[in-house]
Curated annotation (Swiss-Prot):
GO terms for molecular function: ATP binding; ATP hydrolysis activity; proton-transporting ATP synthase activity, rotational mechanism. InterPro entries: AAA+_ATPase, ATP-synt_VA_C, ATP_synth_F1_bsu, ATPase_a/bsu_AS, ATPase_alpha/beta_chains, ATPase_F1/V1/A1_a/bsu_N, ATPase_F1/V1/A1_a/bsu_N_sf, ATPase_F1/V1/A1_a/bsu_nucl-bd. NCBIfam families: atpD. Keywords: ATP synthesis, ATP-binding, Cell membrane, CF(1), Hydrogen ion transport, Ion transport, Membrane, Nucleotide-binding, Translocase, Transport. The keyword Isomerase does not apply. F-type ATPases have 2 components, CF(1) - the catalytic core - and CF(0) - the membrane proton channel. CF(1) has five subunits: alpha(3), beta(3), gamma(1), delta(1), epsilon(1). CF(0) has three main subunits: a(1), b(2) and c(9-12). The alpha and beta chains form an alternating ring which encloses part of the gamma chain. CF(1) is attached to CF(0) by a central stalk formed by the gamma and epsilon chains, while a peripheral stalk is formed by the delta and b chains. This is ATP synthase subunit beta. The keyword Lyase does not apply. The gene is atpD. It catalyses: ATP + H2O + 4 H(+)(in) = ADP + phosphate + 5 H(+)(out). Its main location: membrane. Belongs to the ATPase alpha/beta chains family. Produces ATP from ADP in the presence of a proton gradient across the membrane. The catalytic sites are hosted primarily by the beta subunits. ATP binds at residues 156-163.
Length: 502
């Protein structure tokens, strides 16, 4: 097949129009095109629409600085490809599948690569089993348990702890799960990606070899000491398109990460599929970038200025994040909530696709309770006695009822004070405040902030602890004894100590 080439005819920021000769087959929608820039680097474009007889409108995956009209453009004949295979373990890629860890690019043509735009699995291929995924985080395991192979959303405004919670989940699940993890950094801070890589190296989820670790401990970052034979034992792969990237890259990087997760899930052949964890931080930036691209392409905006295709784009991606008979993808997605408004179209569209939602609340964060999960706003599809068992379900319902009662009484307390409450209500408020504080716990990834060692709490201990508080066995202990504690034994010990000192 002869190479199809065209010329740049218009450049408006990241939107580039390419003109081809008359009679040539135009590149298909979502095909990638390449421009060789003056400095020798290659700029990748993705076709978005066909204009007139022989022009395509594209969006660039990197900055269009230095481009000029008339530059030659080559059609690749396929969508953007991501490298797959055993060599991707422990590696960092960008949106177009190039390595960004300084360890050299991997081949991604033919059987070594997969296109980032793919169909979702067929209905008959989907898995229907339900299994609980325990995280060791009390509030999540008790109130809104996560399903293995399910989709989980962490909703929260700016600075309430989404990234810390997602890093704790990576720490708890990825270490305990022993399976593979794929992390897609979508339009977030580059520093967080850097911190995460260092943390993964220290915890042994990514392996660069002993020589490199010694150089890292001494404050260096000597890539010549990386042992590539050890690297294949790594349990994670990263794909980054951070907030300094143009909108084209941020709108596609979630799909690039998902492509690698799908490859791990389905394997190269029958019976080779695996259980994969897919972390996305932050899915809102995917929507935000889609809105920027939509505006740049001249589409009429929809509600609150979002793209008219918001639900379609979100659905096309979310339907691919699913579990099949070959393997499962359990995805954890952080969702930024603009101005703490859960009815904003971006978070509201995401809600429809999830099995469990963890809503982080600024009011709870202000009380110093971390993780700042709102137990009354958070939901789970699998919170049912036939899946979790009677004890777990009834304990979760009692906790919710108690906290709901406390919420209703707060207006009365604010106006009239505690004295005006009946004895029964006073007791309920005291227990609710203890329950609220006991829902907090110290995190491994936040040790440097809290000075407390992180804990994983078994679900049996969690249920026992909350039942003791609600049954009134611990009414004599001060409320502050329950804050940032793991098990109920720790809280009792701290409470007895406080009483002795008083």
């Amino acid at each position: 097949m002869s190479k199809v080439t065209g010329k740049v005819s218009q450049i408006i920021g990241p939107v580039i129009d390419v003109e081809f000769q008359a009679g040539v087959d135009l590149p298909k929608i979502y095909d990638s095109l390449e421009i060789k820039k003056a400095d020798g680097s290659i700029l990748v474009l993705e076709v978005q629409s066909h204009i007139g007889e022989n022009t395509v409108r594209t969006i660039s995956m990197d900055s269009s600085d230095g481009l000029s009209r008339g530059a030659e453009v080559n059609a690749t004949g396929s969508a953007i490809q991501m490298p797959v295979g055993d060599d991707v373990y422990g590696r960092l890629f960008n949106v177009i599948g190039d390595a960004i860890d300084g360890l050299g690019n991997l081949p991604k043509s033919g059987k070594d690569g997969l296109p980032i735009h793919r169909e979702a699995p067929k209905f008959e291929d989907l898995s229907t089993s339900t299994e609980v995924l325990f995280t060791g985080i009390k509030v999540i395991d008790l109130i809104e348990p996560y399903a293995k192979g399910g989709k989980i959303g962490l909703f929260g405004g700016a600075g309430v702890g989404k990234t810390v919670l997602i890093q704790e989940l990576i720490n708890n699940i990825a270490k305990g799960h022993g399976g593979l993890s794929v992390f897609a950094g979508v339009g977030e801070r580059t520093r967080e990606g850097n911190d995460l890589l260092r943390e993964m190296l220290e915890s042994g989820i990514i392996k660069y070899g002993d020589d490199f670790m010694h150089s890292m401990e001494e404050g260096g970052w000597d890539l010549s000491k990386v042992d590539k034979s050890v690297m294949k034992d790594s349990k994670a792969t990263f794909v980054f398109g951070q907030m300094n990237e143009p909108p084209g890259a941020r709108a596609r990087v979630a799909l690039s990460g998902l492509t690698i997760a799908e490859y791990f899930r389905d394997g190269a052949g029958e019976g080779q599929g695996k259980d994969v964890l897919f972390f996305v931080d932050n899915i809102f930036r995917f929507t935000q970038a889609g809105s920027e691209v939509s505006a740049l392409l001249g589409r009429m905006p929809s509600a609150v200025g979002y793209q008219p295709t918001l639900a379609t784009e979100m659905g096309a991606m979310q339907e691919r994040i699913t579990s099949t008979k070959r393997g499962s993808i359990t995805s954890v997605q952080a969702v930024y909530v603009p101005a703490d408004d859960l009815t904003d179209p971006a978070p509201a569209t995401t809600f429809a696709h999830l099995d469990a939602t963890t809503v982080l609340s600024r009011k709870i964060a202000e009380l110093g309770i971390y993780p700042a999960v709102d137990p009354l706003d958070s939901t789970s599809r699998i919170l049912a006695p036939e899946i979790l068992g009677k004890d777990h379900y009834s304990c979760a319902q009692r906790v919710k009822e108690l906290l709901q009662r406390y919420k209703e009484l707060q207006d009365i307390i604010a106006i009239l004070g505690m004295e005006e409450l009946s004895e029964e209500d006073k007791m309920a408020v005291g227990r609710a405040r203890r329950v609220q504080r006991f829902l907090s716990q110290p995190f491994h990834v936040a040790e440097q902030f809290t000075g407390l060692k992180g804990v994983l709490v078994d679900i049996k201990d969690t249920i026992k602890g909350f039942n003791m508080i609600m049954d009134g066995e611990l009414d004599h202990l001060p409320e502050s004894a329950f804050n940032l504690k793991g098990t109920i034994e720790e809280a009792i010990e701290a409470g007895e100590k406080m009483l002795a000192e008083a």
